[in-house]
Curated annotation (Swiss-Prot):
The organism's place on the tree of life at top rank: Eukaryota
Temperature-related activity annotation: Optimum temperature is 30-40 degrees Celsius.
Species, as recorded: Triticum aestivum (Wheat)
Reactions catalysed according to its record: Hydrolysis of terminal, non-reducing (2->1)-linked beta-D-fructofuranose residues in fructans
Single GO molecular function: hydrolase activity
Gene this protein is translated from: 1-FEHw1
Catalytic machinery residues: D76
Protein name as catalogued: Fructan 1-exohydrolase w1
Listed CDD domains: GH32_Fruct1-like
Disulfide bond positions: C447-C493
Signal sequence segment: 1-20
Family per record: Belongs to the glycosyl hydrolase 32 family.
Keyword Hydrolase: yes
Glycan attachment residues as annotated in the record: N169, N237, N249, N568
Length: 597
């Protein structure tokens, strides 16, 4: 369960090119937004003064192809699975409004991970062990094709325990009704050293070599954060193993742990309960510090423990699933297409009063295929192929050269609903600026200090999206290339500081680094999906992913927006291929299996 309450505190154009006059070395104050001569200047040191929103917070911020219910609050994905021809998405849902509270398990089904039918809640708060909330959990498919939900419930004193539910009728293709086990809760935090209010979010179960089921639960043990390990013969009666799957003494409570097997360089998924191929690694993910982090290592069967390849004490250096507004992710093995899929919760970053006016809050990111890179060091992610079924009106350009200060407008696509794929080829790598390893501790800070208005040797180059006519509003997604002693480091940023003129918004600069062998690859790829208030960007083939929430006034006012490719580095950047599509609207919880969705 994500502790959601913590988040509530709250042109002069020549053809398609724009001249280098758009890139003064550093502009501020009255020059921001224009130079007095009709030219648009967007790389400002200081954003224009906020303006009040439209009389009503526009429904235009509702996404067109992301998963979200028609109304009210949602947070964590819970128990995704593929079963009997349908994908099931359960999620944390408030039946009563667009604020956190009264949490039940929402439920939707799909055949393609794009279009969803909303159903009645699978689990509601109606027993003593879950009266405070039906919190996050997982689904495990038992032998014989028997799905079982295991989830965290809170009692009247907010003590947490794990509960189980089974489908009432497995022949129902939608699995609408679920029956809770009579002996719930099946797992309590009764052991010495455990914290009864920090014990939640059980993982999908897996079978060990001894034939026993295993499961991890996020918790605190003797003040340490841990993925606690449990065993069972029948999935109903559980015994705590005398050591955790893994623990750490320097981090906050681990929420929403996830544990799965991956094979280096192979994007096929692995079922953790099946035979794991030789050479496979394991990933342990935890939601902590308001972000999702992970480690790569091995599952030591003799010790029944996860062993990281590299033990990093400073959790600021732990690997990240996503560097933006992304939390409480959940993965599952998709037996339909033999892949592992992950998605996360992206919260709103406007104000709670905006959410009340909108009548909804929260969405899930586009489902992503997730696998291990060839070098076995990091996870890669890419939107599932099904999302491409929404593409229409393809625009394609080849052989674009971007010199310092150039903007190239990507026209004839819907700038509010678009999928853009672009590759940047570097003519020279000699101009890369030196890399400072201390930047790894806070890449967001470095993105803020070295924004797109600050020229570098190689970069910044990337995309300007959701840009208003006069550039007063725009979001930048871009790269900078640095030279370390024996390798190149690429910084990817998603800078929202000038994304909107509306007040009371979070407008940070997100960022993450990745290693890149520029001498071999020479090209850095970027894919950005724009869906009104949600932007998901994938850099370097999925090495860094950044989810952003943006609320430009131009969208609320039903105005016009623009997309540009740009370069503000000294080195020329070539774009061998640029493709963009308008994205059609998906049918997300519009077809109702239940009147309240």
């Amino acid at each position: 369960m994500a502790q959601a309450w913590a988040f509530l505190l709250p042109v002069l154009v020549f053809g398609s090119y724009v001249t280098s006059l758009f890139f003064p070395s550093y502009i501020s104050g009255p020059l921001c937004g224009g130079d007095g001569g009709g030219r648009s200047l967007f790389l400002c040191a200081q954003a224009p003064k906020d303006q009040d929103p439209s009389p009503a917070v526009s429904t235009m911020y509702k996404t067109a192809f992301h998963f979200q219910p028609a109304k009210n609050w949602m947070n964590d994905p819970s128990g995704p699975m593929y079963f009997n021809g349908f994908y099931h998405e359960f999620y944390q849902y408030n039946l009563n409004g667009p604020i956190f509270g009264d949490i039940v398990w929402g439920h939707s089904v799909s055949t393609d991970l794009v279009n969803w039918i909303g159903l009645e809640p699978a689990l509601v708060r109606d027993t003593p062990s879950d009266i405070d909330g039906c919190w996050t959990g997982s689904v495990t498919i038992l032998p014989g094709g028997k799905p079982v939900i295991i989830y965290t419930g809170g009692d009247k004193d907010q003590h947490q325990a794990q509960n189980i539910a089974f489908p009432k009728n497995r022949s129902d293709p939608y699995l609408r009704e679920w029956i809770k086990a009579a002996n719930n809760p099946v797992l309590r935090p009764d052991e010495p050293g455990m914290n009864s209010i920090e014990f939640r979010d059980p993982t999908t179960g897996w079978i060990g070599p001894d034939g026993l089921w295993r499961m991890a639960v996020g918790g605190e043990l003797n003040g340490y954060s841990a993925a606690l390990l449990y065993k069972s013969e029948d999935f109903l009666n559980w015994t705590k193993v005398d050591h955790p799957l893994y623990s750490h003494n320097g981090s906050n409570m681990w929420e929403c742990p996830d544990f799965f097997a991956v094979l280096p360089g192979n994007n096929a998924g692995l079922d953790l309960s099946a035979a794991i191929p030789q050479g496979a690694k394991h990933a342990l993910k935890m939601s902590v510090d308001s972000v999702d982090k992970y480690m790569i290592g091995v599952y030591d069967l003799q010790r029944d423990a996860f062993v990281p390849d590299n033990v990093v004490d400073d959790r600021r250096l732990w690997l990240r699933i996503d560097y933006g507004t992304f939390y409480a992710s959940k993965s599952f093995f998709d037996s339909n297409k033999n892949r592992r899929i992950i998605w996360g919760w992206s919260r709103e970053t406007d104000s709670p009063s905006d959410d009340l006016e909108k009548g909804w809050a929260g969405l899930h990111t586009i489902p992503r295929t997730i696998w291990l890179a060839d070098n076995g060091k990091q996870l890669l992610q890419w939107p599932v192929e099904e999302i491409e079924s929404l593409r229409t009106n393809e625009i394609s350009h080849q052989g674009i050269e971007l010199n310092k200060g150039d903007l190239f407008e990507i026209k004839e696509v819907d700038a509010f609903q678009a999928d853009v794929e672009i590759g940047f080829e570097l003519a020279s790598i000699d101009d890369a600026d030196p890399f400072d390893p201390s930047w790894l501790l806070d890449p967001e800070k470095h993105c803020g200090e070295a924004g797109a208005s600050v020229p570098g040797g190689i970069g910044p180059f990337g995309l300007v999206i959701l840009a208003s006519d006069n550039m007063d509003e725009h979001t930048e997604v871009y790269f900078r290339v640095y030279k370390s002693q024996e390798k190149y480091m690429v910084l990817m940023c998603s800078d929202l500081r000038r994304s909107s003129l509306r007040p009371d918004l979070e407008k940070p600069a997100y960022g993450g680094f990745f290693e890149f062998d520029l001498e071999k690859e020479r090209k850095i790829s970027l894919r950005t999906l724009i869906d009104r208030s949600a932007v998901e960007s994938f850099g370097g083939g999925g090495r860094v992913c950044i989810t952003s929430r943006v609320y430009p006034a131009v969208l609320a006012d039903v105005g016009r927006a623009h997309i540009y490719a740009f370069n503000n580095g000294s080195a020329t950047v070539r774009v061998p291929q640029l493709s963009a599509w308008t994205m059609r609207k998906a049918q997300v919880n519009v077809e109702k299996g239940w009147s309240a969705i």
